[in-house]
């Protein structure tokens, strides 16, 4: 659906060259929700603007639905953009227009007239849950309602791709979740490919199938969301994952557990989706005659499944403890004995 090959974006300012996007390669499948996460200055917003030709690459190619966006110009590019909707952090609504008129705007530009345009506007208002707000102005809407207008407007011409540039960054947590649920629903109903740019790992965890982590213009990590959460490789990825896992990996927690539970062994357990909700702990304790004392843990849900992390104290004979760890591994639970 979307292919980026060796994409580079370089800016020149006062004889200084800034490499905003540094040789990025990506393949995004039709119908998936793909996340790009990074801190400010990582290059993620520059990257997404090349998907619809708002920015042109200095080198490399950007292909969307078999069309080389990086090489077309003029009317061909304008027509291609009708198939690539976009929503923004600050909504970018026309304040002198009502909700219905804002949604109708791209239809007007596309030459859709009369009853056909009114029908499409009403259809979109129902899709995003704004019934009764048709004649309201942006100043009368909440932040979440404004973003719903932005989403409806972006979908007006039945695009195949929806770009979301920090679309929830200006919203409170509850409204953020409501907008994310709406995007999930739209993805499932319309089989729409959605690209999400964000600095919030909660957004990635909640709706994305795959994620690319950017730092200094490069994609430093790429994979299924569940795999990235389980085994983050890069330091920047580990920092992002800790946003939504309560800092499980902090040295402070590990030292606290080792200092306060001197008997037996302290073991970190990592459960995957197939066993994250099963009574594995009680089964292993019973069959190996050990006591398993749960000290700390959490369960994280992603679009690819759930995974859980537990820190447990294992009490029993040396042979029984080793047998229990062996059985846990056989049950596809990853184990790590913490060293004192």
Curated annotation (Swiss-Prot):
Superkingdom of source: Bacteria
Keyword S-adenosyl-L-methionine: no
Molecular function GO terms recorded: ABC-type D-methionine transporter activity; ATP binding; ATP hydrolysis activity
Chemical reaction(s) catalysed: L-methionine(out) + ATP + H2O = L-methionine(in) + ADP + phosphate + H(+); D-methionine(out) + ATP + H2O = D-methionine(in) + ADP + phosphate + H(+)
Domain ABC transporter: 2-241
Entry EC no(s): 7.4.2.11
Pfam families, alphabetized: ABC_tran, NIL
Similarity section: Belongs to the ABC transporter superfamily. Methionine importer (TC 3.A.1.24) family.
Known partners and oligomeric status: The complex is composed of two ATP-binding proteins (MetN), two transmembrane proteins (MetI) and a solute-binding protein (MetQ).
Protein name: Methionine import ATP-binding protein MetN 2
Organism: Listeria monocytogenes serotype 4b (strain F2365)
Originating gene: metN2
């Amino acid at each position: 659906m979307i292919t980026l090959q060796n994409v580079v974006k370089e800016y020149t300012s006062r004889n200084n060259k800034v490499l905003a996007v540094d040789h990025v390669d990506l393949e995004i499948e039709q119908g998936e929700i793909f996340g790009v996460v990074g801190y400010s200055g990582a290059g993620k917003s520059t990257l997404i603007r090349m998907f619809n030709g708002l920015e042109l690459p200095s080198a490399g190619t950007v292909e969307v639905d078999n069309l080389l966006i990086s090489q077309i110009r003029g009317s061909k590019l304008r027509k291609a953009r009708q198939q690539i909707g976009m929503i923004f952090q600050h909504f970018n609504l026309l304040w002198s227009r009502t909700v219905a008129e804002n949604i109708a705007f791209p239809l007007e530009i596309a030459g859709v007239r009369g009853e056909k345009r009114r029908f499409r506007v009403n259809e979109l208002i129902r899709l995003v849950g704004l019934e009764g707000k048709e004649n309201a102005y942006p100043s009368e809407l909440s932040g979440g309602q404004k973003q719903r207008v932005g989403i409806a407007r972006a979908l007006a011409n039945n695009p195949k791709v929806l770009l979301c540039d920090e679309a929830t960054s200006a919203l409170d947590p509850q409204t953020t979740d409501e907008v994310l649920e709406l995007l999930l629903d739209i993805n499932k109903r319309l089989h729409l490919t959605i690209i999400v740019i964000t600095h919030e790992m909660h957004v990635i965890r909640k709706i994305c199938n795959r994620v690319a982590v950017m730092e200094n213009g490069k994609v430093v990590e790429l994979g299924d969301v569940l795999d990235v959460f389980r085994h983050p490789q890069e330091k920047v990825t580990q920092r992002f994952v800790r946003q939504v896992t309560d800092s499980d990996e902090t040295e402070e927690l590990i030292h606290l557990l080792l200092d306060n539970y001197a008997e037996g062994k302290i073991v970190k357990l990592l459960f995957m989706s197939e066993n994250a909700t099963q009574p594995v702990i009680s089964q292993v304790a019973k069959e190996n005659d050990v006591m398993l004392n749960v000290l700390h843990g959490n369960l994280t849900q992603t679009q690819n499944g759930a995974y859980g992390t537990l820190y447990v104290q294992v009490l029993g004979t040396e042979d029984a403890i080793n047998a229990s760890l062996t059985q846990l591994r056989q049950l596809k639970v990853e184990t790590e004995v913490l060293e004192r």
